[in-house]
From Swiss-Prot:
Ca(2+) binds at D682. Changing Y556A: Reduces channel activation by 4-alpha-PDD and heat but not hypo-osmotic cell swelling. This is Transient receptor potential cation channel subfamily V member 4. InterPro entries: Ankyrin_rpt, Ankyrin_rpt-contain_sf, Ion_trans_dom, TRPV, TrpV1-4, TrpV4. N-glycosylated. Residues 491-507, 569-572, 637-665, 686-693 are extracellular. The ANK repeat region mediates interaction with Ca(2+)-calmodulin and ATP binding. The ANK repeat region mediates interaction with phosphatidylinositol-4,5-bisphosphate and related phosphatidylinositides. It is found in: Cell membrane; Apical cell membrane; Cell junction, Adherens junction; Cell projection, Cilium. Signal peptide: none annotated. It comes from Mus musculus (Mouse). The gene is Trpv4. The chain crosses the membrane at residues 470-490, 508-534, 548-568, 573-593, 609-636, 694-722. Glycans are attached at N651.
């Protein structure tokens, strides 16, 4: 007998309808455990099936053993309503491929399932007996329904930005003691959590689920871990939500993340964030501050460096040792728009660092390669940034120590500028920018960078001080050495074996010539090794083009030393080695044609034709010769050992090439083919061919391909090379001329380098600590007819050179220097045109002259000495 307080029991022949169905059963009734127990009645025996169940065909959802296992698991896990477990199994269906997300959204496609409560509802029905309901029993309250969340559901919700679907997420996490950073909520391929997913799916710069996710993370106690959770795959390793917010240009989310404890020094080191030459796509310096700077977001840069929560340290370096200034140089591409924003951002960061860290100069920090931002710009050929750095002029007195260009005096359109030579010309103490420009052949536009002031005038000054005299002394010395070598080789004895005796005056003169030749060979050997190693040629192309003469001098010295060793050993083969050294020595005299523009351009043409056009021609021609020689020799009749005699049997000989084919025929035939190419050969071998027609046909095709085709192609290519060199002869010769100057300077000892150093020591202002700012500067007198005394921070109010000089240490032994007037003349900032747009930066890339203070190109000569002026 049933207890009146029990819930209603269904009769065996009735069907229990689920809540919310059209049966009219109240949706507020609880699911009776007795009905759940009756669901599995008669499962082991088929005799208890009702007629309704027996007549209904079995469907795919009637797997009773699986259903029993799911409900038993529900009881073990403590699910309040087992029907919820049935609904949760709907998310385990096959995943529909979603649209691709790139970049950084996902490396792989994952499925997205959107569940609608009215779709695909399936209810298990059980026939139970009808029992009258007790009108006195109150309906029990249903237990709360707990939503189930997993990665596909959560990622789909945040992608749509639906905050309503996140209801119940906090309860689910707290009930099951889970966190949003658990592995089950991460993308397996990248380790991405739902926060980066939400930031990558913004609508009009917003995603309303982001504050909700941060609130949930705070309540679950892992806010910092959730915000700073990085990507873990090799492609995007190290990237955090802060990087994504900056890349999406969302300052409000950047502020929100930083306020919640985001790491402002997180480093994104994945393959995607490497330079292009290393297989990456966008290198920005790994740090969030560098990313904001490289994407031209000054408002985010200001916030990261000045926020009250955690300030980004601008002095921080990435895994390559690069600062944010290095990163800006790395992304420069010499276009006008790119150069404009890079230079403005560069100055913003440099000035900001000076104000925040007065004792630090961000521009002097070296990376792992030992390069400052200026050196990096020179090495990578970023001419726009390079020109901006070396010509930077700051008129603000508080940050004037960051200037590299100072106006000493101005009078009308004429003004004298002082350029800071630190890092530009280091006088051998460390690697200088000038050496990087001259000896780094990977820069295609280095001849343009050498035309930027003050580099151009600095080279002219070096040539006037020591380059010209040293160069002509070297020319005379080398020619004398080669004349002595030639006379020594010409008057070698014809009889006897080496070493030859020295008896007469001529013999002693020959001995003196041999000693001088050996001495020059040893000298060239060590100097060539020094030049080849100290220049650090970056590749084979640099070695054979820029270092071609150093390589030829090295080979010449080796031949001279080997020839001397063979001579002393008594081997007559020394003569063969000596003649090669003699030829190569006279060819090396072309090196000294660099001193003159006319002959210097000619030597450059010869180098390019030898290493470019002629090399390719010889490669193809050699293949043709080997192929045709192999085929034609095969057609010749082999030689026999039978002797061929005259009619009187007096002269008997064994037949050889060209009468037949023997062991030496192939090499001799190669020489005959070369003679045919230049029109000097004959066809004596035709008589010994097995098939003369085939032989002649092959010879005709060979002559057409080599004499007609290849030779004319070589002539055309050489003409094109000569034309290209002629168009850029001036710039190319200047590069060779600069190389000659630096070669001479590097051959000097350190004390001579300092003695001939260009520039003067001047006091240009005050440093950050208030002490006099003394620098080694180079003076360039310039003229500007478009703007007159605009925004010029001048040092001296009296124009022209002073007649009073001071001496500073070692410099007084070289020459008198310009008087330091800082103690008597207070620097003034003359601002006569406050409406000039000083912020506009326009870098002329075609004609690299001196821009005026507004950045516009001048129509007149930017300096006193023009490029066409004689040296």
């Amino acid at each position: 007998m049933a207890d009146p307080g029990d819930g209603p029991r269904a009769a065996p022949g009735e069907v229990a309808e689920p809540p919310g169905d059209e049966s009219g059963t109240s949706g507020g009734e609880a699911f009776p455990l007795s009905s759940l127990a009756n669901l599995f009645e008669g499962e082991e025996g088929s005799s208890s099936l009702s007629p309704v169940d027996a007549s209904r065909p079995a469907g795919p959802g009637d797997g009773r053993p699986n259903l029993r296992m799911k409900f038993q698991g529900a009881f073990r896990k403590g699910v309040p309503n087992p029907i919820d477990l049935l609904e949760s199994t709907l998310y385990e269906s096959s995943v529909v491929p979603g649209p691709k997300k790139a970049p950084m959204d996902s490396l792989f496609d994952y499925g997205t399932y959107r569940h609608h409560p009215s779709d695909n509802k399936r209810w298990r029905r059980k026939v139970v007996e009808k029992q009258p309901q007790s009108p006195k029993a109150p309906a029990p309250q249903p237990p709360p329904i707990l939503k189930v969340f997993n990665r596909p559901i959560l990622f789909d919700i945040v992608s749509r930005g639906s905050t309503a679907d996140l209801d119940g997420l906090l309860s689910f996490l707290l009930t099951h003691k889970k966190r949003l950073t658990d592995e089950e909520f991460r993308e397996p391929s990248t380790g991405k959590t739902c926060l980066p997913k939400a930031l990558l799916n913004l609508s009009n710069g917003r995603n309303d689920t982001i504050p909700v996710l941060l609130d949930i993370a705070e309540r679950t106690g892992n806010m910092r871990e959730f915000i700073n959770s990085p990507f873990r795959d090799i492609y995007y390793r190290g990237q955090t939500s802060l990087h994504i917010a900056i890349e999406r240009r969302c300052k409000h989310y950047v502020e929100l993340l930083v306020a919640q404890g985001a790491d402002v020094h997180a480093q994104a080191r994945g393959r995607f964030f490497q330079p292009k030459d290393e297989g990456g796509y966008f290198y920005f310096g790994e740090l969030p501050l560098s990313l904001a700077a490289c994407t031209n977001q000054p408002h985010i840069v200001n916030y990261l460096t000045e926020n009250p929560h955690k300030k980004a340290d601008m002095r921080r370096q990435d895994s390559r040792g690069n600062t944010v200034l290095h990163a800006l140089v790395a992304i420069a591409d010499n276009t006008r728009e790119n150069t404009k924003f890079v230079t403005k951002m560069y100055d913003l960061l440099l000035l900001k660092c000076s104000r925040l860290f007065p004792d630090s100069n961000l521009e002097t920090v070296l990376n792992n390669d030992g390069l400052s931002p200026l050196m990096m710009a020179a090495k990578t050929g970023k001419i726009g940034v390079f020109q901006h750095i070396i010509r930077r002029e700051v008129t603000d007195e508080d940050t004037r120590h960051l200037s590299r260009k100072f106006k000493d005096w101005a009078y009308g359109p004429v003004y004298s500028s002082l350029y800071d030579l630190s890092s530009l010309d280091t006088c051998g103490e460390e690697v200088s920018v000038l050496e990087i420009l001259v000896y780094n052949s990977k820069i295609e536009n280095r001849h343009e960078m050498l035309a930027v002031e003050p580099i151009n005038e600095l080279l002219r000054d070096k040539w006037r001080k020591f380059g010209a005299v040293s160069f002509y002394i070297n020319v005379v010395s080398y020619l004398c050495a080669m004349v002595i070598f030639t006379l020594t080789a010409y008057y070698q004895p014809l009889e006897g074996t080496p070493p030859y005796p020295y008896r007469t005056t001529v013999d002693y003169l020959r001995l003196a010539g041999e000693v001088i030749t050996l001495f020059t060979g040893v000298l060239f050997f060590f100097t060539s090794i020094k030049d080849l190693f100290t220049k650090k040629c970056p590749g084979v192309n640099s070695l054979f083009v820029d270092g071609s003469f150093q390589l030829l001098y090295f080979i010449y010295s080796v031949l001279v030393v080997v020839s001397a060793a063979l001579y002393l050993a008594g081997i007559e083969a020394y003569l063969a080695v000596m003649v090669f050294a003699l030829v190569l020595g006279w060819m090396n005299a072309l090196y000294f044609t660099r001193g003159l523009k006319l002959t210097g351009t000619y030597s450059i043409m010869i180098q390019k034709i030898l290493f470019k056009d002629l090399f390719r021609f010889l490669l193809v021609y050699l293949l043709f010769m080997i192929g045709y020689a192999s085929a034609l020799v095969t057609l010749l009749n082999p030689c026999t050992n039978m002797k061929v005699c005259d009619e009187d049997q007096s002269n008997c000989t064994v037949p050889t090439y060209p009468a037949c084919r023997d062991s030496e025929t192939f090499s001799a035939f190669l020489l005959d083919l070369f003679k045919l190419t230049i029109g000097m050969g004959d066809l004596e071998m035709l008589s010994s061919a097995k098939y003369p027609v085939v032989f002649i046909l092959l010879l005709v095709t060979y002559i057409i391909l080599t004499f007609v085709l290849l030779l004319n192609m070589l002539i055309a290519l050489m003409g094109e090379t000569v034309g290209q060199v002629s168009k850029e002869s001036k710039h190319i010769w200047k590069l060779q001329w600069a190389t000659t100057i630096l070669d001479i300077e590097r051959s000097f000892p350190v004390f001579l380098r300092k003695a001939f150093r260009s520039g003067e020591m001047v006091t240009v202002g005050k440093s950050s600590d208030g002490t006099p700012d003394r620098r080694w500067c180079f003076r360039v007198d310039e003229v500007n007819w478009s703007h007159w005394n605009q925004n010029l921070g001048i040092i001296n109010e009296d124009p022209g050179k002073s007649e009073i000089y001071q001496y500073y240490g070692f410099s007084h032994t070289v020459g008198r220097l310009r008087r330091d007037r800082w103690s008597s003349v207070v620097p003034r900032v003359v601002e006569l045109n406050k409406n000039s747009s000083a912020d506009e930066v326009v870098v002329p890339l075609d004609n690299l002259g001196n821009p005026n203070c507004d950045g516009h190109q001048q129509g007149y000569a930017p300096k006193w000495r023009t490029d066409d002026a004689p040296l």
